[in-house]
Amino acid sequence: MKILVTGFDPFGGEKINPALETIKLLPNEILGAKIIKLEIPTVIGKSVAKIKDMIEKENPDVVLSIGQAGNRADISVERIGINIDDCRIPDNEGNQPIDEPVVKDGPAAYFVTLPIKAIVEKVKAGKIPASISNTAGTFICNHVCYGVAHIAAARTAQGKPMKSGFIHIPFLPEQVIGKPALTPSMSLEMIVKGIELAIEAIVQNNSDIKVSGGKIC
């Protein structure tokens, strides 16, 4: 099995992105699966294009994208990507699309095809907080979540099955210095361990487990 793991460069005035720092520290193999690491730009269009180029080069079985979400306190496993770019801030090249589709005439949304509940349970069993998230936002993270899912759906229809998904991670402790009190953070060591456990769950579970992971609202 080949798993392509992507992480963004810093954005929004930050000097570091925990997603990129995390993928740098992942081992090259987890439970026999080859781990391919890719830095991607926090740029509409170019982020997905760079992933697509690597997919065509490596033909991975899975693409797992990692992104920073400064308001999250745990390892947040996304359930769905939606076909909308509605950017509150510009990307790293100044693009700020508002109410534009990620893919013109594409489906309204894609559910991710990774075993999200198995991932959450595996991470929590490792003493690391984790949960299902039902929104990846409307910035670059959702753009990538949806865009890669669209690529995966097309490849699967062509007889080249590929799964994809997205995980949001918190700020690192050094990033919250000077930010409002109680801004959540997580150590890089814990994030890396959480992502390693997530990948183990992907390798071990071809289909998802049946446990509750929903929310009332």
UniProtKB/Swiss-Prot annotation:
A GO term from the CC aspect: cytosol
Catalytic residues as annotated in Swiss-Prot or TrEMBL: 78, 141, 168
Keyword Repeat set for record: no
Molecular-function annotations in GO: pyroglutamyl-peptidase activity
KW rRNA-binding (keyword) present: no
Reactions mediated catalytically: Release of an N-terminal pyroglutamyl group from a polypeptide, the second amino acid generally not being Pro
This enzyme's EC code(s): 3.4.19.3
Highest taxon of source: Bacteria
InterPro entries hit by this protein: Peptidase_C15 (IPR000816), Peptidase_C15-like (IPR016125), Peptidase_C15-like_sf (IPR036440), PGP-I_bact-type (IPR029762), PGPEP1_Cys_AS (IPR033694), PGPEP1_Glu_AS (IPR033693)
Keyword terms, alphabetized: Cytoplasm, Hydrolase, Protease, Thiol protease
Subunit (UniProt): Homotetramer.
PANTHER family named in the record: PROTEASE FAMILY C15 PYROGLUTAMYL-PEPTIDASE I-RELATED, PYROGLUTAMYL-PEPTIDASE I
Family from the record: Belongs to the peptidase C15 family.
Name the record gives this protein: Pyrrolidone-carboxylate peptidase
Organism: Treponema denticola (strain ATCC 35405 / DSM 14222 / CIP 103919 / JCM 8153 / KCTC 15104)
